Amino acid sequence: MITSNRKPTVPDFMRPVAELESQVAELKRLAPKNDKVIENKINRFQDKLTKLQKEIFSSLTPLQRLNLVRQSERPTTLDYIPNILDEWIELHGDRGGADDPALVGGIGKIDGHSIVFIGHQRGRGTKENVARNFGMPAPGGYRKALRLMKHANRFGMPILTFIDTPGAWAGLKAEELGQGEAIAVNLREMFSFEVPIICTIIGEGGSGGALGIGIGDSIIMLEYAVYTVATPEACAAILWKNSKESLAAAEALKITSHDLKVMGIVDEILTEPIGGAQADHQSASKYLRKELIKQLNILLRLNKSELKIQRYEKFRKMGAFYEI
């Protein structure tokens, strides 16, 4: 797991939870061993904390969910991989002179199946975020992903992708290196692969940066994750010329897992631990591993032709609407 000494930034709506967690931790630190009175008091605080977390998390707005998944303690791809896979090794480079740290990948095993994994990788502290470009891949990152996916297709290995990015890097250099072309080629090629592809949105799924590794037979989305064509801030700036309208933009964009399940964009919503995946990395990883194995076993029953046809039809249905 990647660690950082940086003190986490707590969103306003999470402050009551953070304060109560601090009180519980302090009580545990100061409590003498085998003091039943103190133990009972700690248990009451713990029950109160759990109840408060359930109340807050049951009524999160879309914008609050976005702020939640942007927390530095949220598990990243490289936090999940050691807990999900039985063995793994990271592979590097696009064989064109680049090795983008904002997008990682490699090979591994899960439940006896050899797989290729690919995922966006954010940092935690400022230094690490700068090194990983805040999880925004350059063209070389998408070309590295394509190289690994072609390797998977050649050797008959299922592909697992983990989506967590505000978007692809939009700098001048990225455009000069063919950002749009790199993402477009990935989209085209992912429709042609003859192996199962399972995509999991673990945090923030933003725009083409997410789609560049987001074409799959099964799309899993963590309960509090978000998936959107543009960030609410960017949408507000474009439509209202005012980023303060991001709350309205977040509502209109339908970025939550439940909205996207209703619209047929995602297939499965994965329940997160109380307090979100950032509160319990181990439990979040356990839930995700179980779901990945389940989806993998379903998809491995299909032949190559069935996989490609179902994948194509799945995405062709997206965007359908009904007039009332």
Curated annotation (Swiss-Prot):
Listed pathway(s): Lipid metabolism; malonyl-CoA biosynthesis; malonyl-CoA from acetyl-CoA: step 1/1
EC numbers for this chain: 2.1.3.15
Catalyzed chemical reaction(s): N(6)-carboxybiotinyl-L-lysyl-[protein] + acetyl-CoA = N(6)-biotinyl-L-lysyl-[protein] + malonyl-CoA
Keywords attached to this entry: ATP-binding, Chloroplast, Fatty acid biosynthesis, Fatty acid metabolism, Lipid biosynthesis, Lipid metabolism, Nucleotide-binding, Plastid, Transferase
Main location: plastid
Broad class of enzyme this protein falls into: transferase
Single biological process term from Gene Ontology: malonyl-CoA biosynthetic process
GO function term, MF aspect, one: ATP binding
SUPFAM superfamilies: ClpP/crotonase
PROSITE patterns per record: COA_CT_CTER
Places the protein is found: Plastid, Chloroplast
Cysteine disulfide partners in this protein: none
Function: Component of the acetyl coenzyme A carboxylase (ACC) complex. First, biotin carboxylase catalyzes the carboxylation of biotin on its carrier protein (BCCP) and then the CO(2) group is transferred by the carboxyltransferase to acetyl-CoA to form malonyl-CoA.
Family designation: Belongs to the AccA family.
Subunit structure: Acetyl-CoA carboxylase is a heterohexamer composed of biotin carboxyl carrier protein (accB), biotin carboxylase (accC) and two subunits each of ACCase subunit alpha (accA) and ACCase subunit beta (accD).
Matches recorded under NCBIfam families: accA, AccA_sub, PRK05724.1
Protein name: Acetyl-coenzyme A carboxylase carboxyl transferase subunit alpha
Species classification: Eukaryota, Rhodophyta, Bangiophyceae, Bangiales, Bangiaceae
